[in-house]
Amino acid sequence: MAKLKYNIPEPLPTLLEEKKSLYGLRTYISLFSSAGVGCYGFKQENYHCIATVELLERRLRIQQYNQKCIYNSGYTCGDMTAQETKDKVFEQLDMWKRNYNIQEPDVIIATPPCQGMSVANHKKGDELKRNSLVVESIVMIR
């Protein structure tokens, strides 16, 4: 299969500073992103991170070190069940829609913890709250 080519002028940081329209820009949002390892391939393929959410600050710092998002405001350390966390993601999306003429992100990566559903985790107690993060992802994406 032939690789699609997008006409995105470089360097991107200069375009962002000039606030030019970036028609054709490929974007994504990452929920439950841990240290951002799962997003590495997207970055390699010139996708741009609108927002990333991780519960643990130390994992989010690794993403920042690797410059996953263009804007510092794209990094959110928070609980995906909290409305404040969801609002931050939607604020970033709205900013990209206004400034860079995107309609919606091309990809939404949602990798909620699945320990409660794992056979290997049969000895742990009720994991209903953690398992409900799958539902939280679906509701947010709608």
Labelled PLM ranges:
Residues 1-142:
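Conserved active-site and SAM-binding loop architecture
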